[in-house]
From Swiss-Prot:
This is Kappa-stichotoxin-Sgt4a. One of its GO terms (cellular component) is nematocyst. It is found in: Secreted; Nematocyst. The keyword Lyase does not apply.
Length: 74
């Protein structure tokens, strides 16, 4: 009887380990895809309310080579 309980617990732990590993890998894939989309996107202008020198310098538009290196409405 003890052997069956131990075997059941080990089986459950193994299944949970597999599920957690699969979810972590899926999250990694989603992070890579989202990161790629974020790198590819470029906003046309920065809203006037968020328009500071720091925001202009570090905006997606400024950092990406294929975007214009201006700050839009600043």
């Amino acid at each position: 009887m003890k052997f069956q309980v131990i075997a059941a617990v080990l089986l459950i732990e193994f299944c949970l380990c597999v599920v957690v590993t699969a979810r972590m890998e899926l999250q990694d894939v989603e992070d890579v895809e989202n990161g790629f989309q974020k790198r590819r996107s470029c906003i046309d202008t920065i809203p006037q309310s968020r328009c500071t020198a720091f925001q202009c310098k570090h905006s997606m538009k400024y950092r990406l080579s294929f975007c214009r290196k201006t700050c839009g409405t600043c």
